[in-house]
């Protein structure tokens, strides 16, 4: 009978060990390390995120119960203090750089719904206890961090992530996050609507779509009434008043009626070629990033941290993103028709099971569990027990 690795071990085969070792060597990550190497820490953190463990005790206990199944991963008995020290001492840049390396090597052949690549940019704030995470203090009684994120709108995969203090403004965070490419479309909410910021995108021959702020002073150059569509007006405008110098070029303003809310929405863009309804539809795509934030918070538990150190928090976040990438890689290679949550659920329930991962993901799960009818003797024994 052929030897079969556990599901967790098969997931870890997606990790390029040689590439990971290069990152470890760069930052001397395993220097004077005897108990928990950088790779073993990644293994433990992947287990943590997949099992949604939120305490050191829960992780150590869970791994201890499965130790016989994980011996081939070179995981020995781990103490809480060992795991806590590792999160403080291993350099978080190892996991950050490996995330981008893994991202580059993923096969992401994707049909683009709108032709152009859609990049969605936003941030999410993760609140923390100010007494425990004083390095993340940003208000009198609050602490927290922000994840400034750019995702691919068609795959919902994060391509750039910057972790900052929660007090950092979204535009300052995105300037560290985003690399603009000619012809691609960048979608923002109104929090990023700033003349100077948008003009930097224009100068790099990329496109943006955002919402018009109500206090912006603009002047209509030409106006077109659109009939027979949900888009009401398609106007060419320019920035008026003292701010004109911050964005001297013409802009396009699409006025759209949103039936579900009954609201009139105004979309601002520098793309003059796409149909007005397509502009509105692309902006609707912005919800993909909200779904991504919800997914990683709900399923990979990045709202509860095992370490109070800044380094430990970053390690946990980057390991959760690596786990998210691996789940997407498995989906794209093995079971494109299966929902990402279904893949996650099956893998988490069988992490220590020695079964082929493809068999696990393609096996038909019965809706009902057959129950054997007990014999008369069994019923009598139960009655008199």
Regions picked out by a protein language model, each given a short descriptive name:
Residues 75, 112-113:
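Short helix-terminating capping/connector loops at secondary-structure junctions
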Residues 64-73:
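Extended, structured, electrostatic nucleic-acid-contact surfaces
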Residues 103-110, 171:
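A short, well-structured juxtamembrane/interface segment
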Residues 136-140:
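Extracellular beta-strand-rich solenoid/capping regions of secreted or surface-exposed proteins
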Residues 1-58, 62, 88-90, 97-98, ...:
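Single, function-defining residue in the core of a domain
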Residues 72-90:
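Major-groove recognition helix of helix-turn-helix-like DNA-binding domains
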Residues 93-105:
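Short Lys/Arg-enriched helix C-cap and helix-to-coil transition segments
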